[in-house]
UniProtKB/Swiss-Prot annotation:
The gene is MAL31. This is Maltose permease MAL31. It is found in: Membrane. High-affinity uptake of maltose and maltotriose. Also transports turanose but not alpha-methylglucoside, melezitose or trehalose. It is a multi-pass membrane protein.
C-alpha cells in the first residue's frame, strides 16, 4: 500500500509539472479569450455578459487538457481512497485526532437516551414508584405498575422517537447536522420539566413522548456524523462508540436507581432526582456541538465546496502545503463518490431508498440489521431489574445485578474494538447471535425449575447474554447501518432503519411485558426459549443477506452493490470503482479549437444561447 507521504509527494510533482507547462506555453483559455474578444467586436452582444457553461473548458493544441484534468482528479480521488483503506489505526489517530474528538462529542448525546430508557424500566421495580403509581396485586400483596401502563409508557417514547426521526430528515436537509442536534438538545431540556413535575402516569407518558422526539434525532445523526467525518480506520470505533454511550447511560441509570433505592425508598426524590439529573447534559453538549465542524459530505451535497474544504481542514492535524494537498485529495474523493451516486438519481428522497433494486436492497439490509437488535431478545436486558425481581431476588440485589450487567456490557464493547481487528462486521454479528441463542436456551431450561439456585442461575446467565450482545450485534449494528446506505441517502436510510427498529420494538415490548408479568403469561425465565429461537432466525437471515463491509471504503461498497455482488462474496470480490469513470473520461470527444464553441450568454436580464464561430 502506498504511504500517505509518497501520495502527497506525487501530488506535488504533478502540480509542479502543471506550473512548468503554463510557463512554457500559451494557455488555451487565454488564447480563446482573445478569439472571443475579436468575435465580440463583430457581434451584437456585450462580452462582459458572457459566461462559460459547464462544458466550455477549452482544450489545448494537443486536445489533451480535458481528459488529463479529469483523469488527474480521478487519480487523486483513487489515491486518497487507497490511502484511507491502508491507513493504520495509529496513523489515523495522528492524522484525524480532531475528527475523532468531534465524533465522540456528538455521539455522547446518546448517553441521555440510554439513561432515560433504563430508568423507566427500573422504576417498575422501585417501591416508592410502585406505591405512587401502581396498584395492589391481590395474589402477591405487592404494588405493581399494570402491564397496560408499562406498554403505554413504552409506546409513548417510541412514538416520539418515530416522529423525531422523520423530522430529522428534512431538518438536516435544511440546516445540517450541527444545528439540528442543537435544536434537539434545546427541546429535550424543556421537555424534562414535564417529567420532573409529573403528578400522574399520564404526565409521564406525555413527557416520554416529547422527549422521544430529540432522542430519535440523536439515534440517527450520531451514527451518520461519525461515519462521514472520520476515515475508514476509525469508522468502526467511532460508530460503535454510540453503543458505548448507550451502555454508559444505562450504567449511570442503574447506579442512580440503586442510590434511590437505598436513600430515598420512601421519598418522591427516589424518582424525581433521576429525572432531574438529565439536565446535566443538554447545555454543555449544545455548546460543544456549536463549535464542531459540519459534515463535509453534507456540505459537498449542498454545493458548498469551500465550506467543505474548511470543515476537512478542521478535522486534520498538521499545517502547511501537505495538509492542503491532503484536504484537496479527500475533497476529490467525496465529490467523486457523490457525483457517481447522483448520476443514478438527481434527488435524495425517501422514495429513492426503495424505488430501484440497488437502493431497495441496501435499505432492506439496513432495516433488518437494526431489527436484529429487537429479535435477538436484547430488550429483555433493558428490563433486567424487573426480570431479576420476578426471578425471586431482592430489590437491592436486582439493582446490583443490573450494575454488574451494564459494566459487562461496557467491557464487551471495548473487547469488540479489539476483536474488530481480526473479525469482520458479519463475524461479530453472527457469532454474537449464536452465543446469545445458546445462553437463552439455558435460561429457558433453568426457568423450568422453581429452586432458588435455578433462579439465581437464570439471572446470572442474563448478564452473560448482555456481555455477548454488547460484544457482537449491539455495537456492530451502529457501524453497519452507516456503511450500507449510499452517502446521498445515508441519513434517510438510517432514519427508515431506526424507525423499523422502533416499530418492531413496540411488538417486542408488549411480548416481554406479557411474558414477565405475573398477571399475564408469567413465563419468567422460560421466555428464554422464545428469544433463543428468534436469535437463530435472525442468524439465518444474516448468513443469507448481510454483507461483509469491513475494510471497504464508501465508494467500494457502492460499486459492490451496483454490481449486485451476493452478500457472502462481498469480502472476496475485488472491485475498481474508478475504472468506469476513467473510461468515461477517456471517451470524451474534445473539440478542435477551430470548431464551434457553445457558451451561455446572459444579455441584459435575459438568458440566451449562442454559438460563436471562430
Amino acid at each position: 500500500m502506498k504511504g500517505l507521504s509518497s501520495l502527497i509527494n506525487r501530488k506535488k510533482d504533478r502540480n509542479d509539472s502543471h506550473l512548468d507547462e503554463i510557463e512554457n506555453g500559451v494557455n488555451a483559455t487565454e488564447f480563446n479569450s482573445i478569439e472571443m474578444e475579436e468575435q465580440g467586436k463583430k457581434s451584437d452582444f456585450d462580452l462582459s455578459h458572457l459566461e462559460y457553461g459547464p462544458g466550455s473548458l477549452i482544450p489545448n493544441d494537443n486536445n489533451e487538457e480535458v481528459p488529463d484534468l479529469l483523469d488527474e482528479a480521478m487519480q487523486d480521488a483513487k489515491e486518497a481512497d487507497e490511502s484511507e483503506r491502508g491507513m493504520p489505526l495509529m496513523t489515523a489517530l495522528k492524522t484525524y485526532p480532531k475528527a475523532a474528538a468531534w465524533s465522540l462529542l456528538v455521539s455522547t448525546t446518546l448517553i441521555q437516551e440510554g439513561y432515560d430508557t433504563a430508568i423507566l424500566g427500573a422504576f417498575y421495580a422501585l417501591p416508592v414508584f410502585q406505591k405512587k403509581y401502581g396498584s395492589l396485586n391481590s395474589n402477591t400483596g405487592d404494588y405493581e405498575i399494570s402491564v397496560s401502563w408499562q406498554i403505554g409508557l413504552c409506546l409513548c417514547y417510541m412514538a416520539g422517537e418515530i416522529v423525531g426521526l422523520q423530522m430529522t430528515g428534512p431538518s438536516v436537509d435544511y440546516m445540517g447536522n450541527r444545528y439540528t442536534l442543537i435544536m434537539a438538545l434545546f427541546f429535550l431540556a424543556a421537555f424534562i420539566f414535564i417529567l420532573y413535575f409529573c403528578k400522574s402516569l399520564g404526565m409521564i407518558a406525555v413527557g416520554q413522548a416529547l422527549c422521544g422526539m430529540p432522542w430519535g434525532c440523536f439515534q440517527c445523526l450520531t451514527v451518520s456524523y461519525a461515519s462521514e467525518i472520520c476515515p475508514l480506520a476509525l469508522r468502526y470505533y467511532l460508530t460503535t462508540y454510540s453503543n458505548l454511550c448507550w451502555a454508559f447511560g444505562q450504567l449511570f441509570a442503574a447506579g442512580i436507581m440503586k442510590n434511590s433505592q437505598n436513600k430515598y425508598a420512601n421519598s418522591e426524590l427516589g424518582y424525581k432526582l433521576p429525572f432531574a439529573l438529565q439536565w446535566i447534559w443538554p447545555l454543555p453538549l449544545a455548546v460543544g456541538i456549536f463549535f464542531a465542524p459540519e459534515s463535509p459530505w453534507w456540505l459537498v451535497k449542498k454545493g458548498r465546496i469551500d465550506q467543505a474544504r474548511r470543515s476537512l481542514e478542521r478535522t486534520l492535524s498538521g499545517k502547511g502545503p501537505e495538509k492542503e494537498l491532503l484536504v484537496s485529495m479527500e475533497l476529490d474523493k467525496i465529490k467523486t463518490t457523490i457525483e457517481k451516486e447522483q448520476k443514478m438519481s438527481d434527488e435524495g428522497t425517501y422514495w429513492d431508498c426503495v424505488k430501484d433494486g440497488i437502493n431497495r436492497r441496501r435499505t432492506r439490509i439496513a432495516c433488518l440489521c437494526w431489527i436484529g437488535q429487537c429479535s435477538c431478545g436484547a430488550s429483555l436486558i433493558g428490563y433486567s431489574t424487573y426480570f431479576y425481581e420476578k426471578a425471586g431476588v431482592s430489590t437491592d440485589t436486582a439493582f446490583t445485578f443490573s450494575i454488574i450487567q451494564y459494566c459487562l456490557g461496557i467491557a464487551a464493547t471495548f473487547i469488540s474494538w479489539w476483536a474488530s481487528k481480526y473479525c469482520g462486521r458479519f463475524d461479530l454479528y453472527a457469532f454474537g447471535l449464536a452465543f446469545q441463542a445458546i445462553m437463552f436456551f439455558i435460561i429457558g431450561g433453568l426457568g423450568c425449575s422453581d429452586t432458588h439456585g435455578a433462579k439465581m442461575g437464570s439471572g446470572a446467565l442474563l448478564m452473560v447474554v448482555a456481555f455477548f450482545y454488547n460484544l457482537g450485534i449491539a455495537p456492530v449494528v451502529f457501524c453497519l447501518v452507516s456503511e450500507i446506505p449510499s452517502s446521498r441517502l445515508r441519513t434517510k436510510t438510517i432514519i427508515l432503519a431506526r424507525n423499523a427498529y422502533n416499530v418492531i420494538q413496540v411488538v417486542v415490548t408488549v411480548l416481554i411485558m406479557y411474558q414477565l408479568n405475573s398477571e399475564k403469561w408469567n413465563w419468567g425465565a422460560k421466555s428464554g426459549f422464545f428469544w433463543g429461537g428468534f436469535c437463530l432466525a435472525t442468524l439465518a437471515w444474516a448468513v443469507v443477506d448481510l454483507p461483509e463491509t469491513a475494510g471497504r471504503t464508501f465508494i467500494e461498497i457502492n460499486e459492490l452493490f451496483r454490481l449486485g455482488v451476493p452478500a457472502r462474496k462481498f469480502k472476496s470480490t475485488k472491485v475498481d470503482p474508478f475504472a468506469a469513470a476513467k473510461a468515461a473520461a477517456a471517451e470524451i470527444n474534445v473539440k478542435d479549437p477551430k470548431e464551434d464553441l457553445e457558451t451561455s450568454v446572459v444579455d441584459e436580464g435575459r438568458n440566451t444561447s449562442s454559438v460563436v464561430n471562430k
